From Swiss-Prot:
Single GO MF annotation: arginyl-tRNA--protein transferase activity
Gene Ontology BP annotations: ubiquitin-dependent protein catabolic process via the N-end rule pathway
Family: Belongs to the R-transferase family. Bpt subfamily.
Catalytic activity: N-terminal L-glutamyl-[protein] + L-leucyl-tRNA(Leu) = N-terminal L-leucyl-L-glutamyl-[protein] + tRNA(Leu) + H(+); N-terminal L-aspartyl-[protein] + L-leucyl-tRNA(Leu) = N-terminal L-leucyl-L-aspartyl-[protein] + tRNA(Leu) + H(+)
Known EC number: 2.3.2.29
Name of the protein in question: Aspartate/glutamate leucyltransferase
SUPFAM superfamilies named in the record: Acyl-CoA N-acyltransferases (Nat)
PANTHER family registered for this protein in UniProt: ARGININE-TRNA-PROTEIN TRANSFERASE 1, ARGINYL-TRNA--PROTEIN TRANSFERASE 1
GO CC aspect terms: cytoplasm
Protein role: Functions in the N-end rule pathway of protein degradation where it conjugates Leu from its aminoacyl-tRNA to the N-termini of proteins containing an N-terminal aspartate or glutamate.
UniProt keywords, alphabetically: Acyltransferase, Cytoplasm, Transferase
Amino acid sequence: MLEIGFCTLEDQCPYLKDKRSRIEYNYIENCPKEINNELIKRGWRRFGRYFSRPICKDCDECLSLRILVNEYNFSRSERRVVNKNINTKVILRTPNLSNEHLFLYDKYHRFMEEKKNWKRYDLSFKQYYNLYVDGFMNFGYELAFYIEDKLVCVDLIDILEDGISSIYCFYDPDFSYFSLGKFSLLNEIQIAKKMNLDYIYLGYFVKKCQSLSYKADYTPNEILKGTKELFENEVLWEK
């Protein structure tokens, strides 16, 4: 298992305008599922063959959050979202790359650029592959959502030993009625329940960032306390 670690230089934080960020990376060529799981439990995120976590000076606003699947019950509004999507086709498969994927990805980010002032980058086939397809091994999947044979949402996930790691989701803003972002997460929860998995690892919750603060609405949940290195015995999560 080839592993290469490195860090970025300090830069503008993408989530909080008044903060600076620094990211630690681990490139792992053929990461076993159990190592992926241990890294995710310790606050790392996987994109392709790269694992990353923030190591920012004087800031700990990025908090790893996970949903407690066994205690999670769908609310009335969440059941309405499921009912609205009664005819939405959902396919669980290994990560794909197509013109359809890239078009949908670009459309979603153009919308977010206008709505939330996100920085948008044109992504090539190779860049998309490196970020969302490469390194899927025996744990990486995508949930592909179709309405009338049109790809309207892609939710990239890792199915691990104790839960599902939610990597990235993008959808067609023209289908906002269907609440596809929320519907994709509800599908993750349903899959985890069927597979007797304990957690949905949602990545980072940042209270002052609108794009990430919503994660706390999914309760019950737990927050990772502190940063633990790989193979340290105790990893503390608290409600």
